[in-house]
Amino acid sequence: MSPKIRETLYYVGTLVPGILGIALIWGGIDAGAAANIGDIVAGALNLVGAAAPATAAVKVNQQRKDGTLTTSPVDQVTRGVEQVLAAKQNAEAEVERVKQALESAVNGAVPQLGPLASQILNGIQPAYSQPFDPHTQPWNR
């Protein structure tokens, strides 16, 4: 169905009830005749309206074939990048939560060990990170 035919049907469906109302007010037709004409027009438009899903399906098929409904490659890439950035933010938030949980667990455990144990734990990394020098004594390494 062409756009012009659809437009015409919409106008007819809009104008007929108004014309019938004016004719009824001016006395050109009685209420029974207006109701009958209105029923006939409404029935005809309902038959046309029943074809609306088929018309819509044909129109969507045309739009799909000519590429109206497909997204451009730029839009696809943009959406993909946005999804990757969102996933990155979620992963960073998860890592931060794990870090906080570990820090709270370690910080909670160290004060319970006492000050001497804290000094030992804090000194482990510097002690093992010193380079080996065969001229130093074992007690001074």
UniProtKB/Swiss-Prot annotation:
UniProt keyword Cytoplasm, yes or no: no
Example of a GO biological process term: viral release via pore formation in host cell membrane
Membrane topology, from the record: Multi-pass membrane protein
Annotated GO CC locations: host cell plasma membrane; membrane
InterPro entries (UniProt xref): Myco_phage_holin
Keywords: Coiled coil, Cytolysis, Host cell inner membrane, Host cell lysis by virus, Host cell membrane, Host membrane, Membrane, Transmembrane, Transmembrane helix, Viral release from host cell
Subcellular location: Host cell inner membrane
Recorded coiled-coil stretches: 74-108
Subunit structure and binding partners: Homomultimer. Self-associates to form a pore.
Record's function text: Accumulates harmlessly in the cytoplasmic membrane until it reaches a critical concentration that triggers the formation of micron-scale pores (holes) causing host cell membrane disruption and endolysin escape into the periplasmic space. Determines the precise timing of host cell lysis. Participates with the endolysin protein in the sequential events which lead to the programmed host cell lysis releasing the mature viral particles from the host cell.
Domain notes per entry: The first transmembrane region undergoes a helix to beta-hairpin conformational change, which is responsible for its self-association and pore formation in the host membrane. The coiled coil region is required for host cell lysis and for cytotoxic activity. The C-terminus determines the size of the hole.
Name of the featured protein: Holin
UniProt organism field: Mycobacterium phage D29
Gene assigned in the entry: 11
